[in-house]
Design a protein with these regions (language model features):
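Short loop/turn motifs that initiate or flank beta-strands
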Residues: 1-256
Length: 256
């Protein structure tokens, strides 16, 4: 111990006290240390030899334990973006961090170091390794990746001839442009629903849609917020043909 790492003074009961500085104590790693205090009478340095009597000394065992600190896991809640979550935490420990994840409700054995990217609720487990100064830390938490909202453009509608029904043919000429909000590269497509006019009668009719849905391996990562906006289509009159007429002779009766 260097001279600058301790102070000598009187204790509360009037006895001599040796106080180690905080800078010295914090420099020690966890473990046991033996401190020997030697006393030089009258401030004279002891010189061995002759009839000189060695000064008294005191031995003290100093035990330094590891500090117990916490770790705060930052929120990982987000809307689906096709990218794995990026975990982070605040802690005083300088130990190596290990992150593990599993679906919420799954057994502890399901933990894996692969960071999730798909929509769902997950459990996270952070382990901070023990160091010379700090105890091992283990923290858990929960976060949710929310499905991304997506909407469908209004499909093209075909006019038709009156047939007594409200059904209208609809289609997307460019299926890749049918959706707004899809992330490039995701496997996502539209399941076509039904289009129906507000009346089966002839005229320009308002058409609404039902039954449209999403398909593909990434469909669970999206939330279809509504059916396509309404459109319009024309129902035209159905041509009616009259067959041949038969004319019969008759006696005069004054009528046409």
């Amino acid at each position: 111990v260097r001279d600058t790492e301790y102070r000598i003074g009187a204790s509360a009961n009037g006895q001599l006290a040796i106080t180690l500085t905080n800078s010295f104590l914090t420099s020690l790693t966890a473990g046991s240390y033996t401190l020997t205090v030697s006393y030089d009478p009258l401030g004279e340095t002891y010189v061995s030899g002759g009839d000189n009597q060695a000064p008294a000394s005191t031995t003290v065992v100093l035990t330094v334990g590891r500090s117990t600190v916490d770790a705060d896991i930052a929120s990982m809640d987000k809307i689906y973006d096709s990218e794995p979550v990026t975990p982070s935490a605040n802690t005083e420990s300088d130990g190596v961090m290990t992150w593990e994840f599993k679906p919420d409700g799954a057994d502890p054995g399901a933990y894996t170091t692969a960071a999730p990217e798909d929509a769902g609720t997950y459990n996270v487990r952070l382990t901070v390794a023990e160091t010379e100064h700090y105890d091992r830390i283990e923290k858990t938490g929960t976060f949710t990746i929310t499905p991304k909202e997506i909407r469908l453009h209004t499909p093209a509608l075909e006019d038709k001839t009156y047939d007594g029904s409200t059904a209208i043919v609809c289609m997307y000429y460019y299926p890749e442009r049918a959706m707004e909000g899809k992330i490039s590269g995701d496997d996502l497509s539209v399941v076509m629903g039904q289009a129906n006019a507000d009346s089966p009668d002839v005229g320009r009719r308002t058409v609404t849609f039902t039954g449209f849905a999403l398909a593909g391996s990434d469909a669970a990562n999206y939330n279809l917020t509504a059916q396509p906006n309404s459109g319009s289509a024309a129902i035209t009159a159905r041509p009616l043909s009259i067959g041949s007429l038969t004319v019969r002779d008759k006696l005069y009766d004054g009528l046409n």
